[in-house]
Curated annotation (Swiss-Prot):
The active site is at residues 18, 114. It comes from the Eukaryota. It catalyses: an anthocyanidin + UDP-alpha-D-glucose + H(+) = an anthocyanidin 3-O-beta-D-glucoside + UDP. It comes from Solanum melongena. Signal peptide: none annotated. Gene3D superfamilies: Glycogen Phosphorylase B (3.40.50.2000). UDP-alpha-D-glucose binds at residues 137, 320, 322, 337, 340-342, 345, 361-362. In the presence of other necessary color factors, this glycosylation reaction allows the accumulation of anthocyanin pigments. Keywords: Glycosyltransferase, Transferase. It holds the Pfam family UDPGT. An anthocyanidin binds at residues 18, 146, 360. This is Anthocyanidin 3-O-glucosyltransferase.
Amino acid sequence: MTTSQLHIAFLAFPFGTHATPLLTLVQKISPFLPSSTIFSFFNTSSSNSSIFSKVPNQENIKIYNVWDGVKEGNDTPFGLEAIKLFIQSTLLISKITEEAEEETGVKFSCIFSDAFLWCFLVKLPKKMNAPGVAYWTGGSCSLAVHLYTDLIRSNKETSLKIPGFSSTLSINDIPPEVTAEDLEGPMSSMLYNMALNLHKADAVVLNSFQELDRDPLINKDLQKNLQKVFNIGPLVLQSSRKLDESGCIQWLDKQKEKSVVYLSFGTVTTLPPNEIGSIAEALETKKTPFIWSLRNNGVKNLPKGFLERTKEFGKIVSWAPQLEILAHKSVGVFVTHCGWNSILEGISFGVPMICRPFFGDQKLNSRMVESVWEIGLQIEGGIFTKSGIISALDTFFNEEKGKILRENVEGLKEKALEAVNQMMEVQQKISRF
């Protein structure tokens, strides 16, 4: 079996939007490697089908389907049950990586793993005699919080001081997997054990850029606790090849500059019916032009007659081309769940945000948007109400503060562009592992 040809493994966490950033990483580092390099991408069949349908053919990527833990004939589980079954099947990943080496006849040169999986795969790089790199798809702040899970869990106060943070954090800002009383749950257990083992990775790469780390202590602390740390972002995800069948861009072309509200809450979040109603009432009252990405199961919770009454200034679609929408000059504000990918996309296109976080690192991300980067607002009271949405929209479209927030995000957009231009050197370093 040869070692002269490069062969790099990428091991994906198949839930949420984790797998797509890992594929984006492949696309970003591949230009710096010989054209003969083999990229082996390990992921569940359903996730592979989804992410590879959105990108052009990748001839240099070999796709391997790993078992999702669901026995043949059983119903497909959702949520935590699906994660639990997949975690139980991760022991088989070692076997399929060995099979990939046998199939290609080329030993692995490096193993990239989603950081979520690191606790299950920590021994794999040594077994395969290759360096191991963990990919944290979020920002440095959320990673820093996970590394101090034990300290946070021992805290009995509503605010706490975490090494690396110059200011205190509210316990409400902390991801619930960190503060969970039961560390035996699939997510909390996985992330806790990840934090305990991440220092064993030869490097940790983050989908972030230095200018987002307003607190330099965070990066210093990460460098102290981990072997090597690289910011490689913003890796804005590839635009989907799916056609804009709903005509969002054509509709935006007819709107005034920075006048449109774009609402989207990711592929996982389901808005409570009462909050859907509150959003609808606020949009109808304000008559602000809007595009709302709302799946069909949410449309049924709209007020009766809403679609007809707002058809002259609003558009509701079951799927929206988010990158193209955020890049459009007519979009003035982004109402978001504060998933990390959405935040990076908002920053990269200079669109300020109204934040309604739901789970994971979203509350911490939301705090960063409002209090640290000052490029958006958290919704009043933490949930959508008619008055809270109207107040937030008034801030962006009628008040001086909205102008300041817009200027701040434009400044970060420029920093993001600079980071992209400077990222060649970092990507070259990563490609040499």
